[in-house]
């Protein structure tokens, strides 16, 4: 799809808030409070099933959809979950472009900034939206497939913002009831995702009518996700758009899906966000209206614990934009005994268009589809950064946003354009770039933050575009992006960057494979022969099994070799086993290294996981030695063996490069003739 073999550079934009850190927007209010509910549902909810949490609200000032700060008035979520400390103050989305619909002005921008122009509800028909004040519209939905039986105590602690020890059974039941209400009211007819567990389309995402809450085979949300949140908003409230960005409506509907996995791999530190921008037009829009030079901005105001010592950066290979701590430790995290983390955003997917060419393919609605092509091969097309308290302050209107979207300074505003580089590199010989701070803070090479501007409060902006949206005989057009919000914690500020990049690689790999991670090769079918002080293992007798293993090819992984182990007991794991032999393909692959996080130190390490010698493939072995006890085999003694197959992925950017089959333990007792 993109970036394991494609160079992608990201850049951060860090805004200088005119409102300052003590702005009332940073104060938690009843307007944002999670407990504010309607007869139909709640107006704010939280994604909180893994190691990172995030609030979503449809009540913001003066419009609707937003990510309000609710944790200690400073963060919109926590990392690690339950710590009481977070990384993001606020995040949002902006859309801008040149609109040709018969109205004016041509340049318009709408979205969710510190103030939002998006109000609750979908657009029913061109120019007509749902009533934003209707309790059935002014709400968010949250579901999890296991809500009936799950232990919701930790979930309730996050939702009701109280210590785990103070959560009551009434809290858990109230939350369980809300899950049930959202399940029954799941707005599939508005575009919320759902799936079936049976039939030819089992576990494929569906968007649109057909969901039946009473059908046990129908499940709301993203397949496989532990939790899914959904909301919808639009920009048709002309009073709000003019007030916030000086821009009249465009006729955009924004559908937000957030989901997370509670798992024992790096996905446990990630929240996924799918944003669908549907151009439906205003009431006066022409049937052939279009928007050219469309850009989508995913921006964030990270407060990485203490906001005053943050820096921004990006990885030009991974396409990862992030914020990290300037100092080895962070005051807020140090106060709870934790090292300074890092947080990043990654566009996993940019908008695509229909070409009809069967050689083209793109992910649309979490499904690879032929005949579609991404507008931009690299989904992040601009990445610049701003710092609070510097000469570059927040954009205040559509022309300033449009300059940011194209990699320029917000002022002088469009149609004037000053490249972002000129304000920071101070080198007229440097070719203007849309990608800033793409150096490496760990090795201190390249352009890194903190040299021109001291550490402080940072705002980051990720941009994808340009692309086009158009009405066809009045029919809507859709752009879809998917973003990963990633939290990572190493042993200090710099090792957290390394862990963050590892998690990002894992996220992209999982997404490109639609979260169906490759299974290991099949386990060899082994026959054993118990002889006089000898054991013979033969895994070549079943040719069908051999063919299935040695022709294995899954998601870039190909067969590489066999391992033979002796285990101390029938219940021992491979980590306790003695590797007796490896028979591998004769090629350039010998030692295979994988990245792993040391559970004791949090450091990201490269460790050997498979060790071959180009011995060539064999399908049998004769054993005369007890490798566990380091002595000859003894008749009458039972020994335990396993033969596994392993595969290798040659892609250096794959999150893991070796897969080994599940060991099948064989008990063998040598006997006298």
What are these regions (language model features)?
Residues 7-16:
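Bacterial N-terminal signal peptides
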Residues 1-5:
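Positively charged n-region of N-terminal signal peptides that target proteins for export
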Residues 19-673:
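Extracellular/surface-associated beta-sandwich interaction domains
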């Amino acid at each position: 799809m993109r970036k394991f073999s494609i160079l992608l550079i990201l850049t951060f934009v860090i805004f200088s808030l005119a409102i300052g850190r003590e702005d009332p927007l940073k104060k938690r209010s009843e307007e944002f409070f999670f407990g504010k509910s309607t007869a139909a549902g709640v107006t704010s909810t939280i994604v909180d099933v893994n190691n990172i949490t995030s609030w979503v609200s449809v009540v913001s000032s003066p419009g609707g959809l937003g990510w309000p700060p609710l944790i200690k008035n400073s963060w919109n979520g926590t990392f690690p979950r339950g710590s009481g400390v977070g990384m993001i103050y606020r995040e949002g989305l902006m859309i801008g472009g040149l609109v040709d619909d018969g109205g004016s002005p041509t340049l318009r921008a709408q979205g969710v900034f510190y103030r939002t122009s998006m109000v609750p509800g979908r657009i029913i028909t061109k120019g007509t939206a749902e009533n934003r004040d209707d309790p059935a519209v002014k709400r968010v939905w949250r579901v999890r497939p296991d809500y009936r039986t799950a232990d919701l105590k930790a979930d309730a602690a996050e939702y009701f913002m109280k210590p785990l020890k103070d959560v009551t059974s009434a809290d858990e039941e109230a939350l369980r009831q809300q899950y049930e209400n959202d399940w029954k009211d799941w707005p599939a007819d508005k575009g919320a995702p759902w799936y079936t567990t049976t039939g030819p389309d089992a576990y494929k995402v569906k968007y649109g009518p057909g969901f039946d809450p009473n059908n046990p085979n129908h499940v709301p949300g993203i397949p496989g996700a532990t939790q899914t949140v959904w909301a919808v908003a639009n920009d048709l409230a002309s009073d709000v758009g003019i007030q916030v960005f000086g821009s009249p409506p465009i006729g955009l509907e924004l559908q937000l899906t957030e989901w997370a996995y509670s798992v024992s791999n790096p996905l446990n530190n990630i929240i996924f966000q799918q944003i669908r921008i549907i151009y439906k037009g205003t009431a006066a829009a022409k049937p052939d209206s279009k928007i050219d030079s469309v850009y989508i901005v995913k921006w964030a105001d990270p407060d990485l614990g203490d906001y005053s010592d943050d820096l921004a950066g990006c990885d030009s290979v991974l396409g990862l934009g992030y914020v990290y701590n300037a100092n080895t430790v962070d005051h807020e995290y140090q106060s709870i005994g934790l090292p300074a983390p890092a947080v990043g955003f990654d566009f996993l997917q940019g908008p695509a268009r229909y070409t009809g060419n069967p050689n083209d393919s793109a992910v649309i609605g979490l499904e690879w589809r032929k005949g579609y092509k991404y507008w931009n091969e690299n989904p992040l097309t601009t990445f610049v950064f701003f710092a609070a308290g510097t000469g570059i302050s927040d954009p205040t209107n559509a022309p300033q946003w449009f300059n940011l979207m194209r990699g320029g300074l917000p002022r002088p505003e469009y149609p004037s354009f000053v490249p972002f580089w000129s304000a920071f590199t101070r080198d007229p010989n440097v070719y203007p770039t849309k990608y800033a701070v793409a150096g490496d803070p760990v090795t201190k090479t390249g352009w890194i933050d903190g040299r021109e501007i001291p550490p402080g409060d940072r705002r980051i902006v990720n941009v994808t575009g340009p692309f086009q949206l158009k009405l066809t005989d009045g029919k809507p057009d859709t752009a879809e992006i998917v973003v990963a919000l990633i939290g990572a914690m190493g042993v200090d500020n710099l090792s957290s960057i390394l862990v963050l990049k590892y998690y990002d690689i894992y996220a992209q790999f999982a997404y490109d494979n639609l979260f169906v991670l490759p299974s290991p090769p099949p386990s060899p079918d082994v026959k054993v022969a118990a002889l006089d002080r000898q054991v013979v293992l033969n895994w070549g007798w079943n040719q069908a099994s051999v063919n299935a293993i040695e022709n294995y090819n899954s998601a870039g992984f190909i067969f590489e070799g066999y391992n033979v182990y002796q285990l101390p007991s029938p219940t021992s794991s491979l980590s306790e086993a003695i590797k007796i032999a490896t028979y591998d393909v004769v090629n350039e692959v010998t030692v295979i290294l994988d990245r792993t996080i040391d559970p004791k130190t949090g450091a990201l390490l490269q460790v050997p996981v498979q060790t071959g010698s180009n011995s060539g493939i064999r399908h049998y072995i004769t054993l005369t030695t007890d490798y566990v006890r380091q002595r000859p085999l003894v008749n009458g003694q039972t020994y335990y063996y396993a033969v596994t197959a392993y595969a290798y992925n040659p892609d250096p950017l794959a999150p893991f490069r070796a897969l080994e089959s599940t060991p099948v333990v064989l008990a063998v007792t040598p006997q006298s003739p």
